[in-house]
Amino acid sequence: MSMRDGALRNDEAYGAHPRHRLDLYLPESEGSERPIFVWFHGGGFVRGDKQHRANIGAWGAREGFVTVLPNYRLAPACRWPSGAEDVVAVWAWLRANAQHVGGDAESIVLAGESAGAAHVAAATLMRRLQPKDWNIAGAALLSGPYNPLLEGRARTQFGIATPDPRNEPYFGTDLAGWDAASVVDHVDAAPFPLLIAYAERDLVQMQVQAGELFARLVSRHGFDPELRFLSAHDHFSAGASLGTEDTSVSRELAAFVKRCAAG
């Protein structure tokens, strides 16, 4: 595989499943060993597509990042921990192909929103899901659910329907099995640069879990994550704003990626 600066490469296969496809957006400027920024879309574990966030691919390339938008397997056909496994598979593909896309294999920053953030959180914070050579420059989590067991036990307070149209297709119907998938309760990764963001008009359960994850990482695991409150944004608008005149999110995110790449 060979690519030129400024190219857009669609549907590169990073695995055998039909959903194992990614799009690559490369900067127009000359250079090599650029930061690699990966964005995993949302969709409540059951839907979503990389093309829905093409704005982020274009934005990242303009910022000078090799920007990667993957699809991943969806529920109910594929259940926990398939999403996290796909995050790891994308990472492995990028490590193997970094030189061909002008990226730095040591400067991979993984990011996601909503369900995509949940998958990135699991892959980066739960060591049992990682290969022995796992290494990333950082991760950014936007408006994600990180504790499905809490959501299951507090459905009434959070206003979540029964049956749960989002969690049950991915985690199953037995709450007893949701504990193993609750990232908040099973963090065992060594600290790395991490940004946790939630929106002012986010779903209440997302706001609660952002704070819960932040507190647990700081108090028990030695992390020093950045915490960002996205004023005037809702669950969907933060990702949609990247590449627009609204730079309230993109400015913070670009600066974070550059700090991660600088080490």
Question: Where are the model-predicted features located?
Answer:
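Alpha/beta-hydrolase superfamily serine-hydrolase fold, recognizing
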Residues: 1-263
